[in-house]
Amino acid sequence: MEVIPFTHLKDWLSAAEADALLAMLEARSDWTQGRIRMFGREIPEPRLTFFEGDPGLRYTYAHRSLEGQGWTPELEALRDRFARDFGIKTNTVLANLYRDGQDSMGWHRDDEPELGPDPLVVSLSLGATRDFDVRRDADRWTERFALGHGDLLLMGRESQTQWMHCLPKRLRVGDLRINLTFRQVLS
């Protein structure tokens, strides 16, 4: 049996909780399409994002810097629930809105210096079910998770140091997906 540092909790949120959170997030007006640097050139991100976190905390990825301005009550409640239920403390959330199956995220790891040497990531999925692939560095062994509405993925120790992950394009997916990725940024 393979032991991997990812735990998939299906239906972690009830359907009613997931529906209410999805509606609240869809209605936000601060979704932006950032620009990232890849392979020496600047391109639009193939998704929309927003960032929340403790005031003054900075998170930088792909030459894009984000600063925490505080929390909405709904996302703060989730942050507190992760600490209570799993003992995982987080102080930022990066939200990704994938408008349909054309929006994606390439292979990467969340290993920015401000996340520390072996970061944990708590990932909550809402909306359309999408494949989420993880690949181990040592032998390129790959696992696929079908992350659905209300599912939680805990990305544990070594998930960002020994593995990469991606959200591949899926042309048959016509509905949106929102993914909330909670992290602990070191101050």
What kind of region is each of these model predictions?
Residues 1-187:
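Non-heme Fe(II) oxygenase metal-center motifs and adjacent flexible, charged/small-residue loops
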